[in-house]
Amino acid sequence: MDRRLCKEIEIESLCYSSLSRKTAEISQDVLMEIFTQLSRKVSKERPSSKTTSLQLVDSTTIPLNKTRFPWATFRKTKAGIKLHLNLCYLDRDTQYPERFTITNAEEHDRNHFECLVDKTESTYVVDRGYFDYKLLDRLHNDGHFFVTRTKSNTTITVLEQIEPTHRKTTDGQIISDQHVILGGGNNHVTERFRLVTVLTKGQRLLRIVTNRFDVSSTEIADMYQTRWQIELFFKHLKQNLTIKQLYSRSEQGAINQVILTLIATLLTYLIKIELNSTATLFQLKRSFHYLRFELAEVWLERYRPG
């Protein structure tokens, strides 16, 4: 542990075993309440709506050593935990974790999707791993909007062809815009949905299904394109925050550290809002590390606008 840090906070030493023990002892209920309150505060500072935000839902597996974390085993030779996350996306510089759950890595994403969905009139952008006829019907009937991809073997019945007003998208061009029924026989949706087919610049064909009929086909394509922002968030979380190395080998300790990492992300984002800074969360976090022993004025001067 950094000796200067110990001196600044007036302790003689801080060893790995102490961090391990303390991380495991923290009440998970307390951490969840802190996360919830911070998320609400961010939401008040940067309110979201149907027209201004998207809810990006996905999961990431945090691999663990099977010998050190036997409770996290999910395959014969593998261990890990899975973070299921709802990331509120307003724009490229404005996104923050809003809801999450943590499970063993073997848990299927679909089983925990409902835990992350709580806003009517919101648009949930998800990958095709969540694609399910009953789920799409339920989301629609419960007042939620969605944007996702169909599976390659999805049966599609075209009801109506719509002529796109514009064909160029951020990552390709619109091939078709249709009103459709998905599925067939005894396995199908009960509602009419919209299917936008896109040919990407990499020559991939994406079939995007949604219940948003109020926006253009290019907007639908661009909505799905934002899904990659949650992948970048996961990458940032793993590489630049504190879940590269878990201090505790216990299940509660490991999960607590992931929650603490999400709390740190929200705190960093609140600082970004307070400063009206254009810096990324990673840039702010890095400055915390390099300027942690400097006066607050030094840090503020660096990130004060203008």
What are these regions (language model features)?
Residues 12-13, 18-26, 30-37, 49-53, ...:
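Single, function-defining residue in the core of a domain
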Residues 42-46:
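Alpha-helical solenoid repeats of the armadillo/HEAT superfamily
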Residues 1-11:
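DNA-recognition alpha helix
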Residues 73:
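Active-site neighborhoods of divalent-metal-dependent phosphate/nucleic-acid chemistry enzymes
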